[in-house]
Amino acid sequence: MVKDRMVELLQEHFELNLYEARAYVALVGFGVLTPAELASVSEVPAPRTYDVLRSLEKKGFAISQPGKVNKYRPVHPENILEKFIEEWQERVKEELEAKKKAKEELIELMKPLIETEIPKYGVERVWVVRGIRNATLKTKEMFEEVKEKILLADDGYIAINLENDLIKAIDNGAKAKIIVSKSLLKRLEGSKIMEYAKKGKLELRALDKFELPMLICDDEVFFALEDMAARYFNYETQVWIKDFRVRDLFEAKFNEYWEKAEKV
């Protein structure tokens, strides 16, 4: 029903509870109502009508007309809904600024922990990363910290979704060799990766397919374990290893792909 949809929208987007939304719809429909009248024309229980109408007035959706029996009329929907959106935008803006300031303060406070002499990953050189979000964060971290060399054999996700992070790492001085699957080339048209390849700022080749997508940044290696079910549910398991011997093994495999790949 149309009435149910109006109530649903008011609840979902304009911070009214169920009884408030029903009461406001009734006020808009009837114009002016007393608490008793509201109970008779809406699904708001009689014992709750006074509280509900006062709450609507406090939120700016209704105006009371004092008298022997208080009457309430609605604020025009166009006015109150627009006002709500404007106030919400301002509130979100303030919250965003507060979060940015909190982030900066936290980073400043955590600097001594980040820059400590203790190795960042302790004695651990192997981490298991699960889920697309965590894998993305780990990849971003690798691009931020790489100093010399990036070797990327990519079947789609990194080149498309983390292009800016990759380009920034190259701009900061890292040399990059990238192999992409040929099916990905069309999606890279007009991209920064393609632009940098044409300008000689990175080396780019394409291969029909490769069994082992990988990312190597200096001594760090990141690769996914094959699990189609996990990939379907965006919970693929990836392994991060920081060890020059493992790096050498993966780099040898990357070089095999590189020799077979065609220059773009």
From Swiss-Prot:
The lineage of its organism: Archaea, Methanobacteriati, Methanobacteriota, Thermococci, Thermococcales. It comes from Thermococcus kodakarensis (strain ATCC BAA-918 / JCM 12380 / KOD1). An abundant chromosomal protein that seems to be involved in both genome architecture and transcription repression. Incubation with DNA in vitro gives fibrous structures 14.2 +/- 2.1 nm in thickness (naked DNA is 1.83 +/- 0.37 nm); does not significantly compact DNA. Binds to both coding and non-coding regions; binding within gene promoters correlates with decreased transcript levels, while binding within coding regions does not. NCBIfam families: tran_reg_TrmBL2. GO terms for cellular component: chromosome; cytoplasm. The keyword Repressor applies. InterPro entries: HTH-type_TrmB_regulator (IPR053499), TrmB-like (IPR051797), Tscrpt_reg_TrmB_C (IPR021586), Tscrpt_reg_TrmB_N (IPR002831), WH-like_DNA-bd_sf (IPR036388), WH_DNA-bd_sf (IPR036390). This is DNA-binding HTH-type transcriptional repressor TrmBL2. It is found in: Cytoplasm; Chromosome. SUPFAM superfamilies: Winged helix' DNA-binding domain. Residues 81-113 form a coiled coil. Pfam families: Regulator_TrmB, TrmB. Gene3D superfamilies: Endonuclease Chain A, Winged helix-like DNA-binding domain superfamily/Winged helix DNA-binding domain. Belongs to the transcriptional regulator TrmB family. Keywords: Chromosome, Coiled coil, Cytoplasm, DNA-binding, Repressor, Transcription, Transcription regulation. Its main location: cytoplasm. Disruption phenotype: Slight growth delay compared to wild-type. No fibrous chromosomal DNA isolated from cells, DNA condensation is normal. Chromatin DNA is more sensitive to micrococcal nuclease. Alters gene expression levels of about 10% of the genome. The keyword Transcription applies. The gene is trmBL2. One of its GO terms (molecular function) is DNA binding. It comes from the Archaea.
